[in-house]
Regions:
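Transmembrane-helix exit segments and adjacent C-terminal regions of multi-pass membrane proteins
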Residues: 2-21, 25, 251, 387, ...
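Transmembrane core module of solute transporters
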Residues: 18-71, 75, 109, 151, ...
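A generic transmembrane-helix signature of 12-TM secondary carrier transporters
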Residues: 29, 91, 95-98, 113-114, ...
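Helix-loop-helix hairpins in multi-pass membrane proteins, especially solute transporters
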Residues: 48, 71-209, 213, 226
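Small-residue-rich alpha-helical segments with characteristic i,i+4
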Residues: 158-160, 367-456, 502
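C-terminal membrane-cytosol helix-exit motif in multi-pass small-molecule transporters
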Residues: 181-198, 214-226, 244-258, 513-520
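Helix-loop junctions on the cytosolic side of multi-pass membrane transporters
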Residues: 188-207, 254-263, 360, 426, ...
Length: 545
């Protein structure tokens, strides 16, 4: 191999610098994590002023596309160029995107600027955990990984009320403007606390790998986003995007095998620890969306509670996850990585098993307790995956392996939304054909016009019928004689459909638990030495004099 660039590291920062740095990391982590939940709260006001209801979801999709794609790229650039320059660049991009979002006067502009925000957010997402991996080893590293995991979970709890307060007290534009002063404070602390790295040797950035990865990942995410919604799964648009994705990813793999400084070294996947941990993280995220997306749907559509009440059911789950993230980061030194992840995945799967018992008479307390079981399992697993990866690879690969865990979890979340949504749509449509269509022939003849319309909807737009469960106004337009027959069938069909979704989630998480059995023993602690098996393309860091 030709001359290879190495990064020089200074001595560990002083306690004062470390305090400034950790404060900056906490501020940056919170305001970046809060952004997603706060923006969701402001969405109705944004649409009310700018219009664009039909493209509203692209405010989330644009951010997701760019942030997910940037995560592995940021991790590698942090290894090549140093943490400080990459992190501060991400902060600046995020702040610029936020200000532009606040100044926008059209929904199209806002979507573009959300994509710019996502680039900054995708750089910031892995950097805090990478820097924690640099600063600490052993139990201290585990403790801080748990703390930052808890902070990320906390953002989902406090985000909606904070967003609502900002929108009510000021206006929706301040949801974005508020990022500027907070971001400046975080940048100052990080700039003061984070030591500069001196790069020796030529910097060889894998531009071909970056390009093919962006094309491959974005095309795949767009196909998953469009499939079954804007376009049919076998439409030329979706098939075309998947074809582009496959070709680009194949090209990416070929490039990564040959380049000196690959964005994601392909031979890492031959490492059992790397593959198993990221596989577990991917499957956990796929299954997780069975709870996050579909339990509120169940409680609103079947049980009949309000959106705010169904949202409140999620809060105890997140609080349980936060608590077990912190406790689990300490327990892992007693239990070991393999045992703790296995126990966490089994607990999470058990929670999904409980969800399959829910019915029309399920109480909020029952649903909340089931969600807390899932949160308990998630908290035991999520921070440990990143910790175990950091403890298993040399420091020069810390950026790559840390960002990989976040990347595969993000991709898993997207797959989860798509797979579980498709399962629900397919099952619910077939159930209406089985249950509702025969019932229509028994309805009074005076309701023939409405009956014919419903029969057509069963074949052309079954989800439109289910949406009536979430709209009392729409249901009131249906004649009472039809409504009394229609509502029980719709609820029964939704219960069966969501039971299938929860069973699929159960199976996916259980596969993740089985995959954990392939994990070798992962020693933890500062005295641990990295084995040759885990060292891939390793070059020792050059210590700055």
């Amino acid at each position: 191999m030709g001359e290879q660039m190495t990064i020089a590291t200074k001595q560990q920062p002083s306690s004062q610098s470390r305090g400034l740095l950790i404060t900056g990391l906490i501020i940056a982590m919170l305001f970046a994590a809060l952004d997603g939940t706060i923006v969701g709260t402001a969405m109705p006001r944004i649409v009310g002023e700018l219009g664009g209801l039909g493209v509203m979801t692209w405010l989330t999709t644009a951010y997701m596309l760019t942030s997910t794609t940037m995560v592995p790229i940021a991790g590698k650039l942090a290894d090549l160029l140093g943490r400080k320059v990459v992190y501060i660049t991400g902060l600046i991009i995020f702040m610029v995107g936020s200000v532009l979002c606040g100044f926008t006067d059209s929904m199209t502009q806002l979507i573009v600027y959300r994509g710019l925000q996502g680039i900054g957010g995708g750089i910031m997402m892995p950097m805090a955990l990478i820097i924690i991996g640099d600063l600490f080893t052993g139990k201290e590293r585990a403790k801080w990984q748990g703390v930052f995991g808890a902070l990320y979970g906390l953002s989902s709890v406090i985000g909606p009320p904070v967003g609502g307060y900002i929108v009510d007290a000021l206006n929706w534009r301040w949801v974005f403007y508020i990022n500027l002063p907070i971001g400046i404070i975080a940048t100052i602390f990080i700039a003061m606390g984070l030591k500069k790295h001196k790069v020796t040797g030529p910097i060889k950035i894998d531009f071909a790998g970056i390009t093919t990865m962006i094309i491959g990942v974005v095309s795949m995410l767009l196909a998953l986003t469009f499939g079954g919604k804007e376009y049919a799964w076998f439409s030329w648009q979706v098939i075309g995007l998947m074809t582009v994705s496959i070709v680009a990813i194949a090209s990416f793999i070929r490039i990564e095998k040959k380049t000196e400084e690959p964005i994601l070294p392909v031979n890492l996947f031959a490492n059992k620890i790397f593959s198993s941990l990221n596989g577990v993280g991917f499957l956990m995220s796929v299954g997780m969306f069975g709870a996050i997306m579909f339990v509120p749907l169940f409680m609103q559509g079947v049980v009949g509670i309000s959106p705010s009440e169904s949202g409140a059911i999620m809060t105890p789950m997140m609080l349980t996850m936060i608590l077990t993230s912190v406790v689990g980061s300490r327990m892992v030194y007693r239990w070991g990585v393999k045992k703790q992840i296995l126990v966490g995945m089994i607990i999470m799967a058990t929670g999904f098993g409980f969800l399959t018992s829910m019915g029309i008479d399920t109480t909020k307390l029952t649903a909340t307790s089931f969600m807390m079981v899932i949160g308990l399992g998630m908290g035991l697993v999520m921070p440990i995956i990143t910790l175990a990866l950091q403890e298993s690879f040399p420091k020069s690969q810390l950026g790559v392996v840390t960002s990989s865990s976040q990347f595969f979890r993000s991709i898993g979340g997207t797959f989860g939304v798509t797979i579980l949504g498709s399962v629900m749509n397919a099952k619910s449509a077939s159930l209406l054909t089985d249950y509702l269509l025969p019932l229509l022939h028994k309805l009074p003849s005076q309701a023939k016009g409405m009956v014919d319309q419903i029969a057509m909807e069963i074949h052309t737009n079954p989800q439109g019928l289910y949406s009536m469960l979430f709209s009392p106004e729409a249901m009131q337009k249906v004649p009472e004689s039809v409504r009394d027959q229609l509502i029980p069938v719709l609820k029964h069909s939704m219960v069966e459909s969501l039971h299938v979704v929860f069973m699929v989630s159960f199976g996916i998480v259980l596969v993740g638990a089985i995959l954990t059995l392939w994990l070798p023993h992962i020693p933890l602690g500062s005295a641990r030495k990295v084995t040759q098996e885990n060292s891939v393309n390793e070059s020792p860091p050059v210590m700055e004099k």
